[in-house]
Design a protein with these regions (language model features):
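Mobile genetic element proteins and their domesticated derivatives, centered on retroelements
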Residues: 13-14, 24, 47, 63, ...
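Basic, flexible linker segments flanking DNA-binding modules
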Residues: 22-122, 220, 276-285
Length: 291
């Protein structure tokens, strides 16, 4: 029965074998490792490659989605068992220190129009932005990205060695190209109350491009949780525990850019039906154009 699991529905196999689910799972737990190697040889090879290609970032659920994308339909429990057998595990979430750019009321404070509506129906309609820092022995880098809250895609970003409005300007210039390419006529952009987002030029830029400005309430991180989740995942998957492996700030900057490219193009996500942000966007936009 074990060798048929990858090909047939579990319930059908149980009925044919006249076994209860509990009895089968008990026998499976007692199965020797060589049995798993023999029955799941193709899947084990795929799991090892997927985990390696993700730079050991994927846990069993993301590995499962990646397998599904390759036509291998194993459930999460089987993938978990096989990864345990292979002694593979993903990067574990952990808390991170949030960079704080709040300097009081130094400009315009916009209302919280987003109001924690983090699941827009269409791509390119609702965005979030913030800044985070990466510190190594040589110094610090600051990342300023904009995320599409529908697709989780980082649509524009800038990396700098110092925080300044020049960095925000560079990010906005790249964001402008995205808006033009996708013919975005109106959208919402959410941020915290950092001084950059109260700046007159930032507010005027949004208004000029017909973008609705929204801000978190003071000291309320969860109002901008989408971008915070991205920062947390990014740091767990490419930075924490690896700080000493970066030769210098140039090396760190390259790693940040490589990660964002990988995240957008390849990193699968449960929210996105097991697709990467870019693939989900393409699928969503195709669906919209066909309606």
């Amino acid at each position: 029965m074990l060798e048929l699991r990858p090909k047939y529905p579990f319930k059908m196999l149980l009925e044919e074998a006249q076994k209860s689910r509990g009895s089968y799972l008990y026998q499976l737990r007692k199965a020797p490792s060589k049995c798993l190697d023999a029955v799941y040889s193709e899947q084990i090879a795929a799991i090892s490659k997927i985990h390696s290609d993700s730079k050991e970032r994927y846990g069993y659920r993301r590995v499962m989605y990646a397998l599904h994308n390759q036509g291998m339909h194993l459930n999460h429990k089987t993938v978990h068992k096989l990864m345990h057998h292979l002694q593979l595990q993903g990067a574990h979430p952990r808390a991170y220190k949030k960079y704080n750019s709040y300097k009081g009321t130094v400009g315009k404070i916009a209302p919280n129009i987003l109001n924690r509506e983090f699941n827009p129906a269409k791509p390119m309609t609702s965005f979030a932005t913030d800044i985070t820092e990466f510190a190594i022995a040589e110094g610090k880098l600051y990342l300023s990205p904009i995320i599409d809250m529908c697709t989780n895609e980082i649509v524009a970003y800038d990396v700098a060695r110092h925080t300044s409005f020049d960095q925000i300007n560079r990010m906005l210039n790249r964001f402008e190209n995205v808006l033009e390419e996708n013919k975005v006529s109106v959208a919402l952009v959410h941020s915290d109350q950092g001084w950059q987002y109260q700046h007159m030029h930032y507010c005027n830029w949004l208004k000029k491009h017909n973008l609705i400005q929204s801000m978190s309430r003071k000291a309320t991180t969860h109002d901008n949780i989408m971008i915070e989740i991205f920062f947390g995942r990014m740091k767990v998957e490419m930075f924490y525990g690896k700080e000493k492996t970066f030769k210098d700030l140039n090396d760190l900057e390259k790693a940040i850019k490589d990660y964002i490219n990988w995240y957008n193009s390849d990193r699968v996500c449960k929210k996105l039906k097991g697709l990467s942000p870019i693939n989900f966007r393409k699928q969503a936009l195709n669906s919209v154009s066909m309606t």
